[in-house]
């Protein structure tokens, strides 16, 4: 967010989410192919290759993650430093150079630097500012959004989709194939979100998307609750899953990282983002650990009904407490929270 022009910031930050969905899809495809390979070959020796990719194929699935990890590590060295952070630390010349590369205009870069310096000069130390009522409110809202988003089921579906499909009676191979379709819809919908997030607006996407998520989650719960009496096929479950993933990918998955990267003033952005990010991963960890327990003890129907219920407080928080940030500079958003300049959401 800190190296993006305001009118393009939403789609540029959402590229992160697109990269995540491409990673999920790639993992599903690789795992599907490796499973097919292991099932079509018989172990004829004790070689390392056969041990990893046939006898104990999970080792091959895990080991393939090394390749994108190395690519990620390499790309880090080409990422520019945040110009706002450089200006904050007194390295104005380096900050101005980065801004000139972004805006391709010396005049616009200078204007942006002056605005950033003005906002920075009005703020206190990082920890003191973090505890101010307006900023503390933004941090609490960010934490709530990060955690609640995980308990709306998205990572439960992405992590445990094959297991959930197997509970519906599908074979291991068919379950992985269905999960590939889930990953494909997730990726394509994220591309759509990139195209519309700066035109439609963050909050509208959340309203429409979360409403669709609630409906899809309720239908999934109904499927598991009355599957036999209604005579529903696994294709109905697949359609509901794809509908859920579509609504999720076009709304909260695309919006959450944008909102969290926009909400905080420059002097506390690093700390506040760390708190929000930590909260998000705590939520991810909890849902990753709790989902198998919920599927076993709450039943699949109860689990998805719970996910649907968790969508309600998320929607209320975004509706009542989060300002619309589309098209606004980070400095304008900062002034909203610090009450230096009120801009109607």
Regions found by a protein language model. Name each.
Residues 1-94, 98-100, 120-344:
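Alpha-helical transmembrane bundle of multi-pass membrane proteins
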Residues 106-118:
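Short, well-structured alpha-helical segments
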């Amino acid at each position: 967010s800190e190296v993006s022009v305001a009118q393009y910031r939403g789609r540029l930050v959402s590229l992160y989410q697109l990269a995540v969905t491409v990673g999920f899809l790639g993992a599903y495809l690789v795992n599907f192919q490796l499973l097919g390979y292991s099932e079509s070959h018989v172990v004829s020796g004790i070689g390392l290759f056969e041990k990893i990719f046939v006898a104990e194929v999970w080792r091959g699935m895990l080991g393939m993650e090394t390749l994108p990890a190395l690519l990620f590590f390499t790309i880090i060295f080409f990422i520019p430093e945040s110009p706002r952070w450089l200006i904050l630390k007194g390295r104005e010349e380096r900050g101005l150079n980065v801004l000139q590369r972004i805006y391709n205009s010396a005049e616009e870069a200078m204007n942006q630097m002056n605005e950033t310096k003005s906002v920075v000069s009005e703020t206190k130390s990082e920890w003191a500012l973090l505890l101010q009522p307006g900023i503390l409110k933004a941090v609490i809202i960010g934490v709530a959004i990060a955690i609640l988003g995980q308990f709306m089921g998205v990572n439960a579906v992405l992590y445990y989709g094959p297991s959930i499909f197997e509970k519906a009676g599908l074979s291991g191979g068919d379950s992985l194939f269905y999960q590939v379709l889930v990953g494909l819809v997730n990726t394509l919908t994220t591309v759509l979100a990139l195209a519309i997030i700066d035109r439609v607006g963050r909050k509208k996407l959340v309203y429409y998307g979360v409403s669709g998520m609630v409906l899809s989650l309720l239908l999934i719960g109904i499927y598991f609750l009355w599957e036999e009496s209604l005579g529903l096929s696994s294709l109905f479950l697949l359609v509901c899953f794809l509908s859920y993933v579509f609504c999720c990918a076009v709304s909260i998955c695309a919006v959450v990282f944008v909102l969290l990267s926009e909400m905080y003033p420059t002097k506390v952005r690093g700390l506040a983002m760390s708190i929000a990010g930590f909260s998000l991963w705590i939520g991810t960890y909890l849902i990753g650990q709790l989902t198998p327990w919920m599927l076993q003890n709450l039943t699949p129907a109860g689990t998805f009904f719970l996910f649907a219920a968790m969508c309600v407080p998320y929607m209320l928080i975004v509706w009542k407490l989060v300002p619309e940030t589309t098209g606004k500079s980070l400095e304008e958003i900062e002034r909203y929270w610090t009450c230096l300049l009120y801009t109607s959401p």
